[in-house]
């Protein structure tokens, strides 16, 4: 009555006279789709001009069941392929009056799908639980449903839509100008996305989107991943990926789904494809609406002045002397999950140590390998490789020209070593072009990067969140050097497990036809087979009880499980310390050096293998393989009280 809807209060005594009752079959769904639904009724049209479909949904639950509503929605909108045999509506023309909870604690919610120019429709909800909410909250609810009053001119469908949809408009009115405020908001959204993923997983079928995505990551990346770990990893990646895109955006006055995807550099095609799928911009759309409410993150970032945020980073990190991206990630993890920040401290390596290692590698390349430009060298060499014969009749040996210096960080983490490597290469490059104008240096640098930098720089990382951080960090440092990201040249930093053998190049795309992880896996396999890599740097993980026990890496480890001389099995009852992850990474790096017959390994490691008798076979192997071994003792095993 207050909203001027053409319904008499007496009509509610005979509810069947003003509504149509629906079951699962009526809208082309299976019975299990209604598992959380007590009833679904459509309010009969109140005038001939009404385009809106108004439905009443009673949930058998104490909370709003967004996944159950998704299933209803899928039966009420037009099918992409086969026409439905019942009435259908555009998503924006549907209004759901939802009820859930117990008799003493009932909640009424009104849901609408906001129409967007780009991306997935986003669910908008206003709700009220009169038994538990105070007068102010109830008054706010009443004010907002006031927008749902019946329009005077029912023939003006656009005005009708504008009025009703205005009931659901919410916005961040204040521009975010400092990193502390932004990290709190983004961390809260990441937590919400993580929880929504778990909620969806709990109610959807095995062929649902989240189930398929989770299975794909387990099959091809981390085989013992739990759904909690998956939800956590995915949520962080989405939030940090969008933040990365916003930081690369050249405009401060606008930001939307299309811009977010466009601003993800071509150097990271995996994240670009993942965001296209997540935000509904891929050619193969698999989501009906923004069920994870990722658009909330886009909205926050729309009202974020990233120029001020980045200036705030630099102020807090001594004018950029420290890594501002790591600084933000640490703040983000503190707000998101303090325990996880402690657990993930392994990703952070002190910048002075990183600087020293990268400079040392650059110096050795110049003095011992005779490469005047060090890490920036453009020199090439001829290598042998096996290729398929032209008519497919077996394999044959061939040769090709490859760069003399190719770098790999097999435990990339957040990309600290690769960032410093780029900076060192840039310093060497500028020194070589000393005396030229800034315009000329920038021009030649933009020619150098896709031809001589990106193809030589490689990184492997197992966890998706630091992987996204690494790509953001490296894109930003390239941007700072003046690189304009022309072309489709990617950064060879891949989401993969270094300690697993390279698979076949004809990787079967298991999730969707345009599966981002499938493309990433194919390219990671090709990078793993690169027999030209000869500089391996980084800070591999330390884990006495390593989970990396695949046959391929364990077979390689047999090299270190022999007595000096390499013929007799190591006479140790329990050589378990040889199975530490960092030892496996040293052995992994050794394979590249053996393939090239020359190279450098520069790792930060524990010092056990230098003295402990269990490692005598490993020490002998390294001493016979390498001409020079430099050990810098940092007293990392000392305890500071």
Task: Name each model feature, range by range.
Residues 236-250, 330-331, 472-479:
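Short, hydrophobic/amphipathic alpha-helical patches that form generic packing surfaces
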Residues 1-229, 233, 299-330, 564-573:
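Short, basic/polar, glycine-containing "phosphate-handling" surface segments that engage DNA
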